Amino acid sequence: MARFRRADLAAAGVMLLCHFLTDRFQFAHGEPGHHTNDWIYEVTNAFPWNEEGVEVDSQAYNHRWKRNVDPFKAVDTNRASMGQASPESKGFTDLLLDDGQDNNTQIEEDTDHNYYISRIYGPADSASRDLWVNIDQMEKDKVKIHGILSNTHRQAARVNLSFDFPFYGHFLNEVTVATGGFIYTGEVVHRMLTATQYIAPLMANFDPSVSRNSTVRYFDNGTALVVQWDHVHLQDNYNLGSFTFQATLLMDGRIIFGYKEIPVLVTQISSTNHPVKVGLSDAFVVVHRIQQIPNVRRRTIYEYHRVELQMSKITNISAVEMTPLPTCLQFNGCGPCVSSQIGFNCSWCSKLQRCSSGFDRHRQDWVDSGCPEEVQSKEKMCEKTEPGETSQTTTTSHTTTMQFRVLTTTRRAVTSQMPTSLPTEDDTKIALHLKDSGASTDDSAAEKKGGTLHAGLIVGILILVLIIAAAILVTVYMYHHPTSAASIFFIERRPSRWPAMKFRRGSGHPAYAEVEPVGEKEGFIVSEQC
C-alpha cells in the first residue's frame, strides 16, 4: 500500500508539474516572440488604458500615437515633434462602450497631424454608416447636380458656402469642386490644382463623362457642405468598377470622408495620368513682381503642411473623421497669444495685430511687415520696445524644421478664368527642406526700384493730362471769344500763314518739292459721273 501511495503521489506530482509548465508556457510565451497582450492587440489599440508608447509612422508630416486615461493636457510647444504622446480624458473608453462597442469592432487609433486629429472607422464599426450622409433623403431643392462636372473630365467649379468654414485656421466662404475626387481650397486658381491646398477623400483620374450614371452633386444646409461623387469611373481603367464617396465640411471645422463603394484597393489605382491622394494639404502664396515686365507677377506656392491618410484603410463602408486642433490664428490679443499652450509656438505681431506661428496663408504679410524681427521671447512679447531696439526670435527647444513643396507659376496681373483642363502635377517644381528665409520675398531691392519707376511714370502721366486739359480749355475759350488777343495771336500764326519750306533727304532728293499756302491757290472740285 505504501508503494501504491508513493506511486500515486509521484504521478500526481508529475501531473501538477506538467500542468504548471503548460500554464507557464501559455501565459508567458504564447507564440515565439509574442506577448500574451498581443492576442488582444486590436482592442488595446482601440482602448489603450495605460499605454505610453508611441508608434512612429513612416509617412512624413504625421506620427501615430496611443492615448491613456489621464486627464487631457495640451501638447507642449510644437506638435511636429515625433516623440510626444497626447493623453485623453477618462470618459473616452466608457463613452464608446456605452454606445455598444464590442471586441470585434476595429477602430484605428487617433493620429495626430499637428493641425488635425484623424480617426478611421472600418466596415465593422457603426460609425462608418452613421457618418455617411444620405443625400437622397435631403431636401430636393437644396441638392444640386452640377451639370458640367457630371459630364466632363478634369473640370473644376466654384461653390459658394453659406457659412464660414475654418480650414487650417483660415475661414473660407467658397471652395472649388473638381471631378478628380477632391475639393480645392486655394484662392488663386492655377493649372496645378492637384499639387496642394486640397481636401481629397479620394483624388484620382475620375471621368464622370464616361458613364451616364456618374454624377457630382453637393448639398449645403447652412451648417455643412456635402460633396458626393456618385458612380464615377477611372478614365484609364473603366473596368475596375464605379466609385461612390463623399466629403462633408462642417461649420465647426471637422472634415468627414465617407466611402460607400470602393471596388478595388486604393493602393492599386494607377497614378500615371493623375495623382492619387487621400488627405489634406495647405500652402501659402508669395507674389514676386518682375521689374522687366511691369504687368507680370510670379506666384510661388509653398506647401507648409499635409495630412496623408493610409490608403490601405479606405474600403467599402469606411469613414474618416478629422477634427481640427487649435491654431495661433484663433487668438485676438497679445496676452492670450504668447501664453497659449497649444501645439505651436505662437507669436504676436503688433504691426499686423495678428497671432501666428509664422507659417500660414498670411506668410507674405508676416514677413513683409517685419514680424519675424519684432518677435521676442514670450515674457517680453507684449511689452513696448524702444524704436531702436532690435528684436530677436526666441523659440523653445521643441522646434521642428518645416518642410515645403514649392509650386511656381507666372501670370499676368489680370483677372484669371477657370481653366478648362486641369493637368497633373508632373510639371510641378518641388524643393524640399527650404530655409525660413526662402519662403520670404527676396526681391525687396527690385521692388524699391520698381516703386521709384512707377512714381516717375505716374508724375509724367499727370503732367501730360494737365497739358491736354489746358489745351482743351484754351481751345474752348478762343472758340467762344474769337476777338480776344489770344485768338487773334493764334489766327495770325495759323499754319496757312507759315512760309514755304523745303524738306530734303540726305541724298539731296527732295521729299516735298514745295509747300505752298492753300489760300494762294484757286479751289476746284472734281466731279465724277454717277
From Swiss-Prot:
**Record's Pfam families?**
PSI
Bias-annotated ranges (Basic and acidic residues): 378-387
- Disulphide bridges in this chain? none
Tissue specificity statement from the Swiss-Prot or TrEMBL entry:
Expressed in tumor endothelium and in vessels of some normal tissues, such as the muscle and lung.
Renumbered to this chain, region (Disordered) spans 378-399
- Would you name any one GO CC term? collagen-containing extracellular matrix
**Keywords attached to this entry:** Glycoprotein, Membrane, Phosphoprotein, Signal, Transmembrane, Transmembrane helix
Name the residue ranges with Low complexity bias: 390-399
Q: Where is the PSI domain?
A: 327-372
Its name, as the record gives it, is: Plexin domain-containing protein 2
- Give the organism's phylogenetic lineage: Eukaryota, Metazoa, Chordata, Craniata, Vertebrata
